[in-house]
Amino acid sequence: MSKNAMWLTIIFVAAIFGALMGPSIGSLVGEGTMLILAPLFLIGVVGFCIWALSSNKSGKKADPAALAEARRMQAPEGKARIYVTRRGFVAALQGMNVTIGGAQGQIKSGQMLMADVDPGTYMIAVATAKAKLAKPAEIAVDVGAGGVVVIDAMIEMGALKGSVVLTRLDAAQARESVNATKLILWEVPPT
């Protein structure tokens, strides 16, 4: 999502909230107080959104050839392939930091990371870019030579704080998720 679309979304949400809540709050506190509180509230909401998204990084998209190779879902000879995909609307703009071994990257909704690794057991750790917004999660995966594992990362909202949820997808769900997301390059590539 571009920066313009992000700001338009923030403004649209704030406008809807103001339209729904403004009249009832205005009648309770009075017009003069409302003229002072409304701008302060709006500044607070916009400030929170800026803070929440400030740790996001714009990941570099892979070229079409790399994306086509990723969507084949076949590991190179003697290697295993691990995907971490992210889809959905909950906290879609919030970046998720993904770590597999020494590899590090960040994805948002509609994006995926892919790692070709040696066969073995790997710990995949995922946390929101702003760690205070959601509880991080880890999942261990054991993958053999020629094996392909797809992990879906999502944020599940709680009353006050969300939690990152990692799910290993079956073959049909895995293919659907990989085909529906765009490949992002690692910030620190797998070794």
Placement of each model-derived feature along the sequence:
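Short loop/turn and low-complexity linker motifs enriched in small/turn-promoting residues
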Residues: 1-191
